[in-house]
Amino acid sequence: MPRSQRPEHRSPHRRHALPAAALAAFALVAACAGPPKTGDGGSGDQAYKLSADTPAAKGRLDSFSWAVYAEPPTLDYISAFDYPQNTILSNVCESLMRWTPQLTLAPGLAAKTTSPDPTTWVYDLRPDVHFHAGGVMTADDVVYSLGRQMNPDNAAAWAQQFQNVSTVTKSGPLQVTVKLKQPDSQFNQYMATAAGVVASKAGIEAAGKDYGTSGSLDCTGPYQLGSWNKGQSIQLRRFDAYWGAKAKSAKVDFRFLTDPSARVNAMISGEADGGYLIPTESYDRLSRSGVGTLYFGEGLSTVNVNVTDMKGVLGDVRVRKALSLALDRSGFVRTGLAGAGSATGSLTSRAAWAAAPPDVRKEAFEGLTPTAPDIDRAKALVKEAGATGKTVTVATSSIGQDVSLLATAVQSAGARIGLDVQLKTIAPNAFTALFTDAKAREGIDLFPETYYDSITDPLDLLANFKTGAYQNFAGHSDQAYDDLVDKATAAADPAERFTLEAQLQKTASDQLLWIPVAEWPTAVFLNKRITGAPTTISYMYYPWAADVGSAQ
């Protein structure tokens, strides 16, 4: 989904997608091969290296502390679409499937998954899995948990992932069968995200409207929710009845530090042992601090400019192309991302295409949006469109340089080609509303958005431009595009699906439905006391904190 506060995708619905094989369980891992294990950060001159992982923990801990940039408004899994929620929730609530640190698919609460026909998924559950409040997981809990995602009254962030679901039924004490309205190659992949979370039916019903904001989440993960000091911190406690490997730390303290400088100072002073989503302006400071290590990993993330209104000036594709041609992408990577990224003309990351045949992967990245500025051509397009002097409004925020400096870059680009680009400042704690509230987007034509895939498949992002899609804020509608999305979704064969997705990528590029800017890796800082956290975006859904232990 969009990441909202840290604009990314993951919105209520961020269509995150992984390659899936609707007909054969064996294809699950093969279809979503992860990105390269190590190496440079992509094409071009990179100032960073990708690490496959951090060193494994050598021992256990009594506790460790983790800095997060915002307090989650709720930890209800049906609303978990942004970084703060998922960073914490992934350690408490588990899904039917599991996204591994290598960004591949593995069994989760479902020990076995089969697809006897293109419109059926059967999940055989692990036995003797305990909820945090003491109950034992059954098929009834799964049916109830997925049902909450499908209930329109709940306005679930993941509702779009269930649009092709006809029924979810109990087919045995520890077996659940999902019937689809039509083949959906993506559905099972999303069962590794918060869309596939299983919580106790009894626990949710007992909590009522307070579920997710106080008391137990009554899930099955290696940690259970401890204290929640509103506005300050959340503490997780190790769940000793966990069905899998026990967490290495007895406690985890998540500290809400909204100010970027305060967050970095906490990591350097030891107040926080580590954190994800490191402010880009602090990469160098942390790297040279001597108190720990800054790692970069595959983020399946692209930094884009989300076009939210096509009824005004930006309704003319020539104006969108002009802004794109005037953008200094390389300059933004140097300043906004501190050199840790690469300019791109693709809305999707290269790693999202890891499982595609080489020729299809090559085709997907040929002839896309130019990344080098062409001011003369951009000026001509603005003039042709009769848009000279017209106003375009872009949202900005101090939430991070990836937002503020990109907004400034858009303003500068507009000024160079005859557009009047105005900045509208949004408070960091209100930025998420751009993804959830149409009123918050009123008067805004564009905003910076870092989109991360929730599954290892480009359709996760490209499906956002289908008519009625959650993140289709501009209301783009193209029947031919919609038909291609449907065909790609239904394609069980990965080669066929990626071929269709390459066509979608070309259309999205030609129309500049969003303006692509850069690929951006995940960053994680660990001080010398701890190690074991994954370097990849997997931490959004994988119980990463359970792997963190003593470095000595």
Question: What kind of feature is each model-predicted range?
Answer:
Residues 28, 34, 229, 327-356, ...:
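Detector for C-terminal structural segments
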Residues 114, 122-124, 160-203, 227:
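Surface-exposed binding/hinge segments that line
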